[in-house]
Amino acid sequence: MSSCNFTHATFLLIGIPGLEEAHFWFGFPLLSMYAVALFGNCIVVFIVRTERSLHAPMYLFLCMLAAIDLALSTSTMPKILALFWFDSREITFDACLAQMFFIHTLSAIESTILLAMAFDRYVAICHPLRHAAVLNNTVTVQIGMVALVRGSLFFFPLPLLIKRLAFCHSNVLSHSYCVHQDVMKLAYTDTLPNVVYGLTAILLVMGVDVMFISLSYFLIIRTVLQLPSKSERAKAFGTCVSHISVVLAFYVPLIGLSVVHRFGNSLDPIVHVLMGDVYLLLPPVINPIIYGAKTKQIRTRVLAMFKISCDKDIEAGGNT
């Protein structure tokens, strides 16, 4: 390994290249989205935990999804806001590796949970009489543990692969946070093992999940089209709309970001960074909105909470 290795030094985050002077203003919409993500996902976790009628597999998966979104957005947004508002550009090597690990691992866990939710829809629609036996709450928790272990095992090697590299030419990351592809590009030594393993891990996790989610919905559509009445078909499809929306919100930006990272060298770096920032916030922001709008129990509890809060404010105002 080259003697110019500075693995125990710091990296410098650029943020949005070429738009450094506008960082202060970019921080406000990002903070707003982060606040919505925190509020929405905390509400989902609270309602699912406290509402006994929601202690069913699909909603337990939704609770897991909300917890993952909270962790994923919190792993990056505080540092991004510190960078944009206080010019806090430095991030230590170990902190960068930790952030990289959490981003990739949590994304893999979320992908697995989305696959589990697709399986839940498949069993509920294609084998409704077996749903309670196949997917009970114990099995749901076990699937959550498998998702955690699977994501951790596949992406734990990434920081180790980065640690073996030597960095000489630059410690400047043209991004707002640390991801494997960008840190790897700064290395002075051969990065082929990193490239091969990174691509393999993504294909074995995200690729496999997308394939089985697609298969699940192929079987669901085939079953639904065989239902005798139009109302039955509409009702069956209606139970899948929320999950399909969440899947698209997660995978479409992820696939677009992966394509840009690997084949978009001619694109302006601004595009890379903005897509990366939006990708980390889009699912956490819209997931609770989608499920809150489509799930009567969640919608009713949220409205009831606001009503109670407003009534207390009115009473307090009347007593003064």
Curated annotation (Swiss-Prot):
It is a multi-pass membrane protein. The keyword Transmembrane helix applies. Disulfide bonds join C96-C178. Residues 49-53, 120-141, 222-239, 291-320 are cytoplasmic. GO terms for molecular function: G protein-coupled receptor activity; nuclear steroid receptor activity; olfactory receptor activity; signaling receptor activity. Olfactory receptor. The activity of this receptor is probably mediated by G-proteins which induce elevation of intracellular Ca(2+), cAMP and activation of phosphorylation of the protein kinases PKA and MAPK3/MAPK1. Activation of OR51E2 may affect melanocyte proliferation, differentiation, and melanogenesis and may increase proliferation and migration of primary retinal pigment epithelial (RPE) cells. Activated by the short chain fatty acids (SCFA), acetate and propionate. In response to SCFA, may positively regulate renin secretion and increase blood pressure. This is Olfactory receptor 51E2. It comes from Mus musculus.
